[in-house]
Amino acid sequence: MLQMAISNLDGVSSAKVEINCVIAPHKAQAQIPGLANVKNIVAVASGKGGVGKSTTAANLALALAREGARVGILDADIYGPSQGVMFGIAEGTRPKIRDQKWFVPIEAHGVEVMSMAFLTDDNTPMVWRGPMVSGALLQLVTQTAWNDLDYLVIDMPPGTGDIQLTLAQKVPVAGSVIVTTPQDLALLDARKGVEMFRKVNIPVLGVVENMAVHICSNCGHAEHLFGEGGGEKLATQYGVEVLASLPLAMEIREQADNGKPTAIADPNSPIALIYQELAVTSGRGLF
């Protein structure tokens, strides 16, 4: 439209308009060194498992990429890594090693992906103590050769223990997104997640409420299976915004299981547009 308007001006025979968007780097903790080739790190966390944190992280990364950003995702959920499956990366895929030191992330759907699952067998449980896991995770963070990323999304392990604290204190996270369901038990643990980030001076960008409502595919009846308004209550309590409220929908699960999360499997669907808005508001929250 701008190009057309300029072309229609008197004395203008032709016009060419180029728009260049530059994403600025942000770092909440000045004392922590930045990560090479990464501008902004966004941690996606939850107080407990089973609330859809990993699905949210995957769709957030893909939605950011659809906005034109260069994006990577790090699966920091050591005990239950799932990003490889969600991004359709074949079992047994291993990252290349550069200069005998750097892991080269695997690219899928336009996003760079790194996970401990790429370095271990899928059937082997991670029977490691906290300090060992923390050390391995820091090595994964600092020795991955990311390629000039605007955003690195970290899929955090659930909870608020040693692993989460180590990441929060030693990785230059710019902001965090808290994922919860409306259920009281989930909200109780989500509050602990918010408090943890506040104690280490990492901004909480907002809350994502998963499984907010279920709509019957046969009759269209809406039912709040896990309670109602929990995400809004949590956001109000801590003075942050609800970044997204997502339904309990079968297609979200099916598309993630099939290796193409909703943000790219059905990009024009109402649910995908919610993820797209989540990407925009999360990015805006860093500024």
Swiss-Prot record:
Biological role: Binds and transfers iron-sulfur (Fe-S) clusters to target apoproteins. Can hydrolyze ATP.
Gene3D superfamilies recorded: P-loop containing nucleotide triphosphate hydrolases (3.40.50.300)
InterPro entries recorded: Mrp-like_CS, Mrp/NBP35_ATP-bd, NUBPL-like, P-loop_NTPase, YlxH/NBP35
Gene Ontology terms for molecular function: 4 iron, 4 sulfur cluster binding; ATP binding; ATP hydrolysis activity; ATP-dependent FeS chaperone activity; metal ion binding
Keyword Signal appears in the UniProt entry: no
Family: Belongs to the Mrp/NBP35 ATP-binding proteins family.
GO cellular component: cytosol
Lineage: Bacteria, Pseudomonadati, Pseudomonadota, Gammaproteobacteria, Pseudomonadales
UniProt keyword terms in alphabetical order: ATP-binding, Hydrolase, Iron, Iron-sulfur, Metal-binding, Nucleotide-binding
Record: residues binding ATP: G47, K48, G49, G50, V51, G52, K53, S54
Subunit annotation: Homodimer.
GO BP: iron-sulfur cluster assembly
Signal sequence extent: none
Record HAMAP family: Mrp_NBP35 (MF_02040)
Protein name: Iron-sulfur cluster carrier protein
